[in-house]
Amino acid sequence: MQTFYIFFSHKRNVTNKEIPYVIVFLLATFCYVFFGFLCGRMNVNGFLNSLTLFLLISLPLCKKSFGEAVLNSFATLFSLLVGLSLLSWIINQTIGLPQLGTLELVGQHRSYLHYPFFVIEMADYAAVDILRFSGPFDEPGVVGTYGALILAISRFNFKDWRMVIILIAGIFSFSLFFYIVSFVYLLFYYVVVKKKVIASIFLLASLFAFYLGTKDNPIFYEYIWKRTEWNDESKTIEGDNRSNDSVDAYLKRIRGTSEYYIGTSDDNWYNTVAGGGSATYKSIICINGIIFFVLYVGFFILLGTSNKKTKSEAILYCIVVLANFYQRSSIYFPVTVFLYCAFAMDYFLYSNRMKKSLRIVQS
């Protein structure tokens, strides 16, 4: 509530072009709250608490200068946190560090080895993915997801020391999402947006050289190249673990019913799909209904297409955001919502040197 109050205190007047996506957001949130109460996903207290979600509309409606200040503070904190964690992780990989104990993720039956500033997930008392950097987060995908988003917002500006740290962290996370989004963004940006042929050729040549240099490396093959191989049985790449047969079967079974449109109760979902399925957009449709899902995703699409200066930049924004929805389909998470808004509205990520230059110009 305090965060939303701060954003509201820096709000600006809504323009005519913003009215459509404001309405879509309010409709999506109304459907989320009303359908949730109707289907038993929330009780009276949950219903009342969920009303605060309407306040998230303050994130894209704040003054641009304030939004940029928040974005830069977040990027600095994220890069410092990840950088400190990465340094500790590298030391542990080379000479070793003492364990500080174990941590339990309540409700998800997940355990972690705790080291200074980072964790490594455990399974059956053994480390899992010890070579993948997850920092202080519950899985490496968090580093890859937020790292790719921040880099995309900055347009991969490696003159900014924070982006260099985030790039290195993303590489060591071995997040397939990070690798794919980074390459697709850079290729689309240089070919379509900037129309720089030489830069595009250099990028493709660099990727090819990277592939030749790492394809026979067991670590890179296991974590990257093997996961890009096509699986004829699942009809997707090996690294696509965003769904499973039980989720697909459930979605197919409810198609055309009221559950498909407005969702179902959490108990029914978890009892029908073992473990609640997986981190996929299909789970959002099954739980909250297709009506809410279309409105919620539609809000971010409208936000980007209404604010991006060119059609090609809007398409690039949509590619990154939709890919993120596919990879990490959280809804109403304030950090993710804010980063989408910052990306859509071209909030400027400036380094300390650039910030000083701006002050000189303004003075």
Regions found by a protein language model. Name each.
Residues 37-91, 296-302:
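Transmembrane alpha-helical segments and their membrane-water interfaces
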